[in-house]
Amino acid sequence: MKYLLPLLSAFLFTAWFSEHPVHAQSLPSDLARVASGSTKAVNALWGENPVAVQFRTTTNVVVADLKGPAEITMIHFAYPGHRDPVTHSLNRDVRLRIFWDGETTPSVDCPLVDFFCDPNGERDWVNTALVNVRQGFNTYFPMPFRKCARVELLYDGPLPAGRELESIMPCYSYVCYHTLKRLPADTGYFCASWRQEELLVGQKEYVALETTGRGKFVGWNVTVRNPYLDKYPVDENEKFFIDGETHASVEFQGLEDSFGFSWGFPPTENLFPLTGYFAFHTNGGAAYRFFVQDAINFHKSLKVTIGFGDTETGWKKNYSVPVNALQFSSTVYWYHIGPHSPLPEMRPAAQRAPEARRLFWPAGLPY
């Protein structure tokens, strides 16, 4: 019998994966198939390209303007040509924006670095199944569209267009896409949005996403820190309210557990394909999770929040005290069928960096 167990395990493993291909962590099941359509790539930013798609002439560069139906398969941005981590590195003052099928407001609007799981641009490398960073930024989210797509880099920091700005922005980009004859009716459009808020979580939950319509949630990255203290709690619950629920049908009991860890985040960083953690800023943590096999479908609406559980009265009381205010930021990724709710208004560039460390003086002190 003991000799049959390995064979039985191998058979079951093979049978399961034949029915459940893991596209994000293995080769696509149709890699050998020569499909119709063609693969194309659009370049921008580098000196060989027209000046209209370089930061020397504009602060809003259209890095790709595509006709459909098609699907974006990869987007790459090179590091700035004069990147100096001491004097300047990419931060939240440059945004990635993507518009589908002629829409006037974007479906993707995030600080570039946060989109790539590099909040505030403080990482030297990130390694996940769907985005990575190492001397460049790459994303592999499939992004289908029917009529047209426009991919932009928008700089809204203090510098004007010109050579100085060009020297500190990504110096090269390409967008790879594959042309298609048509898209199935249930194909969603890729969306991503960024939020940041400081709040008393004992009194109010942090809202990472609130949207109406039909779609599925496929991932997020989150940062948390306390501007007053060198610690932050991980006892918050992550709640997914689907289709108007008053009690979330998907609720993870513990911030670290929802990202695949337990008993607090680990003492050292861990970057796995679908989940990961690393230190953030001076006294915080950052984590990411991609929902590949466990994407959260919704048909009418979805609200995603971070807050304490209903019975956690002690935590709620403790984190209603001003010294325990928490700062959260998040980038969420989802697919949406049809029009989506407007994305939250982007904060001014000067307000996107993590809030500075602050001293807290209790009321009543004589100074």
Tell me what each language-model feature is.
Residues 1-4:
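Positively charged n-region of N-terminal signal peptides that target proteins for export
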Residues 23-367:
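Beta-strand-centric surfaces of beta-sandwich/beta-rich domains
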Residues 6-19:
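Bacterial N-terminal signal peptides
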